[in-house]
Design a protein with these regions (language model features):
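Glycine-rich phosphate-binding loop used to anchor ATP phosphates in small-molecule kinases
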Residues: 31-95
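Anionic group-transfer/hydrolysis microenvironments
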Residues: 13, 60-61, 67, 104-106
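Surface-exposed cleft-lining segments at the edges of enzyme active sites
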Residues: 18-29, 66-75, 112-116
């Protein structure tokens, strides 16, 4: 998407973090992961401003960190506060995201080493994301913001086309 729209993007910090430590992550890593993700997002947003680009893409955001942290690390509300986020969902709900592209789990699951450990965990986490995005939509409705969630499914080509169309629709709404 970033290439298609010629826009900056942020990657998923936890992937490079896991590669750099060469061990499974532990709860004491949670703050570093969240802070690293936030830093990558801020950097991509700064690049967008410098390029006067209307778009910036984030491979993920701290919502993922919170859900995965809760699932794999049993990260608590205290861990989230320590990471400097205050109430987790409040931060997410107030973040300046206009569109969530929610990838469905309709493609075959593949193991990813130290991450994403099973198809069953993927299904459970997918449900957690769906519930969290529903909560965010409710928050957005009460805050009169425009963040929208679009379901992305199908083959890789279909997924890309759905995502491109969703971003274009978002841009048209903003115009």
């Amino acid at each position: 998407l970033s290439d298609h729209f010629h826009a900056p993007h942020s990657k998923e910090y936890v992937r490079s973090f896991v590669d750099s430590i060469n061990r499974p992550i532990v709860v004491s890593d949670f703050c570093k992961i969240v802070q690293g993700q936030v830093a990558l997002e801020k950097e991509a947003c700064l690049q967008a401003r410098q390029q006067t680009c209307k778009l910036v893409f984030h491979d993920t955001n701290i919502l993922s960190n919170l859900i995965y942290g809760s699932h794999y690390l049993e990260a608590s509300a205290k861990d989230i506060e320590t990471a400097g986020l205050g109430p987790g969902i409040g931060f997410i709900g107030q973040a300046p995201y206009d569109l969530y592209l929610f990838c469905q789990n309709d493609i075959p699951w593949k193991p990813e080493g130290r991450q994403r450990d099973s198809a069953q965990a993927r299904d459970h986490l997918h449900e957690q994301f769906a519930q969290s995005l529903t909560n965010i939509s409710a928050l957005n409705a009460t805050n009169a913001t425009n963040a929208k969630t679009v379901l992305i499914h199908g083959s890789p080509e279909t997924r890309l086309n759905l995502a491109i169309n969703a971003v274009q629709a978002c841009l048209e709404t903003e115009a």
